[in-house]
Amino acid sequence: MAFLILVTLALASAHYSGEHFEGEKVFRVNVEDENHINLLHTLASTTQIDFWKPDSVTQIKPHSTADFRVKAEDILTVEDFLKQNELHYEVLINNLRLVLEGQFGRQVPATGHSYEKYNRWETIEAWTQQVTSENPDLISRRSIGTTFEGRTIYLLKVGKAGQNKPAIFMDCGFHAREWISPAFWQWFVREXIRTYGQEIHMTELLDKLDFYVLPVGNIDGYVYTWTKNRMWRKTRSTQVGTNCVGTDPTRNFDAGWCKIGASRNPCDETYCGPAAESEKETKALANFIRSNLSSIKAYLTIHSYSQMMLYPYSYDYKLTENNAELNALAKATVKELATLHGTKYTYGPGATTIYPAAGGSDDWAYDQGIKYSFTFELRDKGRYGFALPESQISPTCEETLLAIKHLARYVLQHLY
């Protein structure tokens, strides 16, 4: 038994060490003009770089910053290039391995589900069954499809049983490495269960609304971040003619598909796929929403990082018909979020606020007629990026819950 425990601990320690990222750094470069953008294009064409923000070198804009991860063997080359071309930069993360190890509160993550820890998919899957069986009056679970690798895509419905209730659809985990996203929706479900019948606002919301919650949108990719590559972003689909794996699910919806801010190269992180809704994961979500359009009044998709609340459009610079309303609602929502911990969010249309990107689920949902459609980019602003430590799960989820409740109350008061 002692030997088994030691082996288990050793395996866990090896997995969570982030050893593949030893010596890797994350840089932030100040981008002032088109010349700086061209220089970063040159750098990206000669060196393997993982862009964190924006998603791709093609989305860098003047008067902004670019965050990217560099492998240990390329660091000297990159630093020399930045210095020689007088590009001002800072190192956000000096050794990614250490930051990844530091994500966890202790060396070996807790067994079983925890709302204040990052959970493996197998744990989340079991949790969905448990919360459903323990709270049948508030929660039900259904399958809406399977992933490329054959995993069941579960959807939770949270709300007091009732006929013809309006609904809000909420998803997370479409980008596999954004672990704080699935952590939030688990927190949301917990708070709904815990405070129903005790806290007036949550009780009213669950009495009058249904919340469709997709715990992890990109399950295959999420599993891969736990078993092979913590920084994986895309799905895990394969196709004929390339050895490169995966499609960016947030470039795969039929909303200006592959028109701007997306790539047709299967090896790129923003690959839009061979066709709109080519991915089983995006198709499952789209089919469910299409089948329930009459009841779904808002669509929310949760990502990280950069502390932003975005609304359509991202595939075009045009404004929505209800832009003024969406802007006012976003302003009020991020103000509510900031009341707890003082966390500041930027808000606005996706294309102008962050960068243009076609094929996003929020734009697609809006074009389906869901006029309250938003993307949340949770903490932080780059100190940890995708490696947000578990110590920040609670404050992140607490403040985001305030925002979601505020937005949901508005939707309830403005049904259409």
Curated annotation (Swiss-Prot):
Free-text remark on how the cofactor is bound: Binds 1 zinc ion per subunit.
Gene3D superfamilies assigned: Metallocarboxypeptidase-like, Zn peptidases
Localization in the cell: Secreted; Zymogen granule lumen
Domain Peptidase M14: 117-411
Primary location recorded for the protein, binned into one broad class: secreted
Signal peptide annotation: 1-15
GO biological processes: proteolysis
Keywords: Carboxypeptidase, Cytoplasmic vesicle, Disulfide bond, Hydrolase, Metal-binding, Metalloprotease, Protease, Secreted, Signal, Zinc, Zymogen
Pfam families: Peptidase_M14 (PF00246), Propep_M14 (PF02244)
GO molecular function: metallocarboxypeptidase activity; zinc ion binding
Domain of life of the organism encoding this protein: Eukaryota
Binding site for Zn(2+): H175, E178, H303
GO cellular component: cytoplasmic vesicle; extracellular space
Active site: E377 (proton donor/acceptor)
Propeptide stretch(es), residue numbers: 16-109
Disulfide feature: C244-C267, C258-C272
Binding site for substrate: H175, A176, R177, E178, R233, T250, R251, S304, Y305, Y355
Chemical reaction(s) catalysed: Preferential release of a C-terminal lysine or arginine amino acid
SMART domains membership: Zn_pept
EC code(s) of this entry: 3.4.17.2
Protein's UniProt keywords contain Protease: yes
UniProt cross-references to PANTHER family, sorted A to Z: CARBOXYPEPTIDASE B, PROTEASE FAMILY M14 CARBOXYPEPTIDASE A,B
Family under the similarity heading: Belongs to the peptidase M14 family.
Name of the protein this chain belongs to: Carboxypeptidase B
